[in-house]
């Protein structure tokens, strides 16, 4: 049964159920509980599955971990803490995993110090395991297994078939899925849902599932995605903690010019960057979102040019952050941001999720973020603390984006969120997991189908559809052999069983697992050997020695290339090229598109009825939080 948490527990009631050391630590750090903590900690303590939806800075991550740390502490104090994984934390980003690791360090270290003062010895281990984890570290995890394992969906699927480490997962009691809203509507989420059911099957007892999400809709659907179904087809129990609208916000849409229609593109571009620069000057730290990596590089370059000409900001106070920059470059930017060394940071999507980046007092969105949910997620990065206002400015440079943003803000203030659409019955993902299950052990067909149907994404999978995938994977389509596609499993139709085929299938599985498309990237190095980031092969083909381009907000001169490596040197002469990256467009959400159509219809109706321009523009200013320039452009 899916239900909503209604009862808010007092601080005393919550701390009473926690280990005394955890309670003492909490009281020394926080004056009171946040709304999600008042609603969620007791249900987690009572071993209920919980979905928490709340804005950034509301303490939902700590909410998830408090009970877990408390229970592990109880076991440690009884000398009952075994060498196995008790809690699995899953997030879509490696950077977020590293962030959580660092954020757990402080409470675990401070609680350990409190225990030492009382003559108690505790040792709760936590570790990150992703594709970046060295093999030596993975080997160490077998000997000293982390009690809290921090990982990604893809790595979880890999360790489920790791012969030795999978045994460490049998004792898992808690599973935390962070940023579940970003996973649920993609095939990565479908992939994860099957991994969770395979982990459920492996574990000695049914693990408690905790989902953490920013603003999302509908919550009941996401809850069913998180917890799955029992063998009778009923949703497992889940308590929803809905604190989505607890934080105040201030969002407005503006146009940098009075006339968006006839102004020359060059003049519009100039006014845009001047407006952004003006906002950056007025605020302590500004986070600027573009919708593409190319846009990020372009904005950083022009802001640095303005800083150089005006002299009111230093060029090094402006930085870029996106997925095509090297990990070291991104970490350096994040560190500077946390330390308050940056006035402006420009990102495409890489800072959308909950990475801890310190204090942001305003978010600027250039163009349309294409959905109400994404808009609120981005704006929510400002005013990180609970009592602060999330402040956002949406700047538009064409009328279509302007209308999108105006409608988006109107819907955001009315709490009308886009509905999430969770993919169903993705057979390519199913094929991967059938191979993974075959690697684990020999399966009865009906038993395997039962496990798969527990996933929300496959609850409607028919047996015939399942058998067709088995037929494909077992190589029974003889025509595929002409294309060198061979069977990965064996399937005995009479016995109703299947299992792994060949000794290399584990390698094939781990190398081809996941749903993130492969990108053929060219790695960019300085001539001194420093890794800067990636560019597309197509962009490299257009470069000749001496060409200049921007990467990470810095200008480089192309020297030469060898294979998929490009070598560059810093350049100081300007007029560089902006690299382009493939598949960068964000899709417009269906629900928002419908609302935009209705808004345009209403505008046309009022104009045809002879409603005065002043009244129409006044409506846009009031309801859509638009400035006069934006209202004028929408009317025209």
Name what the model sees in each region.
Residues 1-36:
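Pre-P-loop entry segment of helicase/translocase ATPase cores
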Residues 54-56:
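The conserved Walker
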Residues 9, 24, 414, 519, ...:
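Terminal, basic amphipathic appendages of nucleotide-handling enzymes
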Residues 272-275, 337-338, 342-344, 348, ...:
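Phosphate-interacting basic helix/loop segments used at nucleotide- and nucleic-acid interfaces
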Residues 6, 11, 21-22, 38-39, ...:
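Helicase motor core with emphasis on the C-terminal RecA-like subdomain
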Residues 60-61:
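Conserved lysine of the Walker
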């Amino acid at each position: 049964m899916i239900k909503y948490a209604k009862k808010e527990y007092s601080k005393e009631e919550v701390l009473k159920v926690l280990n005394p050391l955890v309670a003492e630590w909490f009281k020394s750090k926080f004056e009171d509980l946040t709304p999600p903590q008042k609603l969620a900690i007791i249900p987690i303590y009572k071993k209920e599955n919980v979905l928490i939806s709340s804005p950034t800075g509301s303490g939902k991550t700590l909410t998830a971990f408090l009970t877990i740390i408390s229970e592990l502490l109880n076991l440690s104090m009884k000398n009952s803490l075994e060498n196995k994984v008790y809690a699995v934390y899953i997030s879509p980003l490696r950077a977020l995993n590293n962030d959580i690791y660092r954020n757990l360090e402080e409470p675990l270290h401070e609680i350990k110090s409190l225990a030492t003062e009382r003559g108690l010895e505790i040792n709760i281990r936590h570790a990150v395991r992703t594709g970046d984890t060295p093999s030596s570290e993975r080997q160490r995890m077998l000997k000293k297994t982390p009690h809290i394992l921090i990982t990604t969906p893809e790595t979880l699927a890999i360790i489920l078939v790791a012969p030795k480490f999978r045994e460490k997962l049998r004792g898992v009691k808690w599973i935390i899925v962070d940023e579940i809203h970003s996973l649920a509507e993609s095939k990565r989420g479908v992939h994860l849902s099957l991994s969770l059911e395979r982990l459920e099957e492996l574990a000695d007892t049914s693990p408690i599932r905790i989902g953490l999400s920013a603003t999302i809709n509908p919550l009941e659907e996401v809850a069913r995605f998180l917890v799955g179904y029992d063998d009778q087809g009923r949703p497992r129990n889940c308590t929803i903690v809905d604190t989505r609208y607890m934080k105040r916000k201030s969002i407005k849409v503006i146009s940098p010019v009075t006339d968006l229609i006839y102004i020359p593109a060059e003049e519009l571009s100039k006014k845009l960057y001047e407006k952004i620069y003006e906002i950056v000057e007025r605020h302590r730290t500004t986070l600027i979102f573009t919708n593409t990596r190319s846009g990020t590089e372009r904005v950083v370059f022009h802001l640095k040019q303005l800083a150089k000409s005006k002299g009111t900001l230093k060029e090094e106070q402006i930085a870029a952050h996106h997925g095509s920059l090297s990990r070291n470059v991104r970490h350096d930017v994040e560190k500077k941001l946390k330390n308050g060394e940056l006035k402006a940071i420009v990102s495409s999507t890489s800072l959308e999720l909950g990475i801890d980046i310190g204090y942001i007092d305003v978010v600027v969105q250039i163009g349309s973020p294409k959905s109400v949910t994404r808009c609120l997620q981005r704006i929510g990065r400002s005013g990180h603390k609970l009592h602060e206002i999330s402040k956002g400015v949406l700047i538009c440079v064409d009328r279509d984006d302007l209308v999108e943003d105006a409608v988006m803000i109107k819907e955001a203030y009315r709490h009308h969120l886009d509905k999430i659409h969770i993919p169903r019955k993705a057979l390519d993902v199913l094929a991967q997991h059938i191979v993974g299950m075959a690697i684990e052990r020999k399966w009865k067909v009906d038993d395997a189908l039962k496990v798969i149907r527990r996933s929300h994404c496959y609850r409607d999978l028919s047996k015939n559809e399942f058998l067709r995938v088995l037929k494909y994977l077992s190589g029974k389509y003889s025509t595929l052999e002409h294309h060198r596609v061979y069977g990965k499993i064996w399937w005995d139709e009479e016995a109703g069983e299947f299992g792994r085929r060949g000794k290399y299938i584990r390698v094939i599985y781990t190398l081809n697992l996941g749903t993130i498309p492969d990108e053929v990237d060219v790695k960019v190095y300085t001539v001194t050997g420093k890794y800067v980031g990636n560019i597309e092969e197509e962009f490299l083909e257009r470069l000749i020695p001496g060409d200049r381009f921007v990467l990470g907000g810095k200008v480089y001169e192309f020297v030469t290339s060898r294979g998929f490596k490009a070598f560059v040197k810093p350049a100081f002469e300007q007029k560089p090229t902006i690299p382009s990256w493939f598949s960068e467009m964000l899709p417009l959400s269906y629900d928002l598109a419908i609302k935009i159509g209705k808004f345009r219809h209403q505008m046309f109706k009022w104009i045809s009825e002879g409603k005065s321009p002043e009244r129409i523009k006044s409506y846009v200013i009031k309801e859509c939080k638009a400035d006069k320039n934006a209202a004028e452009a929408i009317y025209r």
